[in-house]
Amino acid sequence: MKRFYMINYLLCGICLLWMTGCSNMLDEMRPKDKIPQDALSESDLTKLLNGVYAEMEELVFKFYMDGDVKGENFKAGPGFSMNDPMSMAPSSKDVLGQWQKCFTALKQVNFLVETYEASSNKDSQVVKQTGGTGYYFRALIYYHLVTRGGGAPILRKRTYDVVPISPEADVWNFIKEDLGKAESLLPEFTDRFYVSLSVCDALNAKVCLALKDYTNAAIYADRVITKSNFALSTTSAEYANAFISNSNSKELIFALANKRSTGLLLFYQSVNDIDPTWDYSPSADCYSHLYADTSVKKQDIRAKAVFGADNSRIIKFPNGSTGQFVTNEQPSQTPIVVAREAEMYLIKAEALGATNGLSTLKEFMNKRYATVSLPSSMSDTEFQNQILDERHRE
């Protein structure tokens, strides 16, 4: 019996030594389904891109109605209350959620960027698309951050370190740097549901306008406007078509497809649900006056596509039921629009100013109204007010 215990103790000791000796090896072992970053094939990169697109869907969706909420276009919908819609306090649930989502998505996007930068096959079109998409998405994330919070921590790589907040000017420079890199890698537009050079130009136009670089804002916007791939909607039905599943609208420069089997992102659930409870309804002023005729423009084509007879609903995102302006075959797959042609016209007009931009504004408005009678000249204030009103209507 004593011998039996001695043998057991000896075996246990050997096992302990073996486990200790192999601990470093075990620590370095990857999960069986995980591929080292430097061993990713082009097929792997395509799958990785799909995952990042899904992550960005969640991020853009989280910000999508932020402007309407804070701009008081909305009031509380049935079964919902809005305590302080304009709160920007760090403790705010919405603000905190947006901030956290930005950095969750950034981790995935930085993996794309790191993969491109470490690649030994940078001439591959798939690798270029990976890098260009990563740089564009990173610029888009930081655009959301800087336009709401100013300074932000700049993360060029994934890290768990505490990174201090950089000044706002540095964040803008980082965005411009990433867009410059994306511009050299992205292909021309072929599909509205994939990142292209055109959507990079669109974000560049927005950035330049925000920084009051009006010359380049107009140049970038015009690059998009002059592409035959894009066109302004001229009827209510065409306008509505941009916001339904499988959209073929030429207004769309880039949209996230939102074809998910789990974790559905439902626009109609927020403003136009089938059940009698949803988050937001149009404010009384918004519903009654947003698309009202004025002395210089009448019969806005957007009105029918956005509001119906029920003043508590916004039918811009059709729910697939009755009372909608257009049919939406898959309401759960409404695209998450990132950039549209309309904004490029308004950016170009604003950047050119009242004297040189009036013709661009007229061209835009002629597509949106049955009747337009703008004067031959406008003061800077009058012109800016028209731009602001059109942005509000969009």
Q: What is each PLM-predicted segment?
A:
Residues 1-31:
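Bacterial Sec-dependent N-terminal signal peptides
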Residues 22-65:
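Acidic, glycine-rich segments characteristic of secretory precursors and extracytoplasmic regions
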Residues 35-36, 62-77, 152, 188-269, ...:
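Short, surface-exposed recognition loops and adjoining beta-strand edges that mediate ligand/DNA contacts
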Residues 46, 79-148, 161-167, 184-187, ...:
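Conserved, well-structured interaction surfaces
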Residues 49, 106-109, 172, 179, ...:
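Inward-facing hydrophobic residues that define packing positions of alpha-helical scaffold repeats
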Residues 93, 229-356, 360:
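Elongated scaffold/linker segments in the mid-to-C-terminal portions of large proteins
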